[in-house]
């Protein structure tokens, strides 16, 4: 049961999970063989009235790991030149140390148990983060749940009937510049705002805290 005194906390709202928005840009679709080239991480906070907001942010350009396959079509899509010195790229290890440090601080501050990735088509971002974690031997320090995610594509499909990030943002009243898409930082910012909008709308509509009276018995089985 939810403690009615503490319902307006991240801990209560997400069953002890600490939601963290992640967006990655890569050199292909295979997390094992393609490079993680850019990652943005955004933590969230809940105010005293239970409304979800963006909190802290980290953004890194990443050096491709040795032997990574760099697919030209992927690089054309995200407009990344892996060899450009202007990227000021860091290693996967350097980026993950800072990301995990920020997330661990947030977990402790919010009295949560574990972080959970929030992403648009979350299985993709989750797979690349986990692969990088294995490559850098950071598994023990990894604060994220090994398989559970919050997918804003699925949530937007439920709420708006739209699964594309730009379309979901449009329906949510969030300005989305398609010319800035496929930047990890830009997409993470929009995903974070979208997730907050969805969570806050559900609360505003009376869905949180949950009341069994909102549905009738076996409502999903009615023909």
Swiss-Prot record:
Keyword field: Exonuclease, Hydrolase, Magnesium, Metal-binding, Nuclease, tRNA processing
Cofactor: Mg(2+)
Family annotation (SMART domains): EXOIII
Keyword Hydrolase: yes
Protein EC: 3.1.13.-
UniProt cross-references to InterPro entries, sorted A to Z: Exonuclease_RNaseT/DNA_pol3, RNase_T, RNaseH-like_sf, RNaseH_sf
Site (Important for substrate binding and specificity): 124, 147
Catalytic machinery residues: 182 (proton donor/acceptor)
A GO BP annotation: tRNA processing
Binding site for Mg(2+) 1: 23
MF term (GO), any: nucleic acid binding
Co-factor: note: Binds two Mg(2+) per subunit. The active form of the enzyme binds two Mg(2+) ions in its active site. The first Mg(2+) forms only one salt bridge with the protein.
Coiled coil regions, renumbered to chain: none
UniProt xrefs under Pfam families: RNase_T
GO cellular component: cytosol
List of residues binding Mg(2+) 2: 23, 25, 182, 187
Residue ranges of domain Exonuclease in the record: 20-195
Subunit annotation: Homodimer.
Biological function: Trims short 3' overhangs of a variety of RNA species, leaving a one or two nucleotide 3' overhang. Responsible for the end-turnover of tRNA: specifically removes the terminal AMP residue from uncharged tRNA (tRNA-C-C-A). Also appears to be involved in tRNA biosynthesis.
PANTHER family: DNA POLYMERASE III SUBUNIT EPSILON, RIBONUCLEASE T
Family: Belongs to the RNase T family.
Protein name: Ribonuclease T
Source organism per UniProt: Blochmanniella floridana
Lineage: Bacteria, Pseudomonadati, Pseudomonadota, Gammaproteobacteria, Enterobacterales
């Amino acid at each position: 049961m939810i403690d009615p005194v503490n319902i307006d906390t991240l801990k209560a709202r997400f069953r002890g999970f600490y939601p963290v928005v992640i967006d990655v840009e890569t050199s292909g679709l295979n997390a094992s063989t393609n490079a993680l080239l850019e990652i943005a991480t955004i933590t969230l906070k809940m105010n005293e009235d239970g409304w979800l907001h963006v909190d802290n942010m980290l953004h890194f350009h990443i050096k491709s790991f040795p032997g990574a396959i760099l697919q030209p079509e992927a690089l054309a899509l995200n407009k990344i030149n892996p060899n450009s010195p202007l990227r000021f790229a860091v290693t996967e290890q350097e980026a993950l140390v800072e990301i995990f440090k920020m997330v661990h601080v947030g977990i402790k501050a919010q009295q949560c148990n574990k972080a959970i990735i929030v992403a648009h088509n979350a299985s993709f971002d989750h797979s690349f983060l986990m692969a990088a974690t294995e490559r850098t031997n950071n598994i023990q320090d990894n604060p994220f749940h090994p398989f559970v995610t919050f997918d804003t594509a699925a949530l937007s499909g439920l709420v708006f009937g739209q699964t594309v990030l730009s379309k979901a943002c449009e329906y949510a009243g969030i300005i989305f510049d398609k010319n800035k898409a496929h930047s990890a930082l830009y997409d993470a910012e929009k995903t974070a705002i979208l997730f907050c909008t969805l969570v806050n709308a559900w609360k505003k509509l009376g869905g949180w805290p949950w009341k069994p009276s909102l549905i009738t018995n076996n409502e999903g089985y009615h023909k």
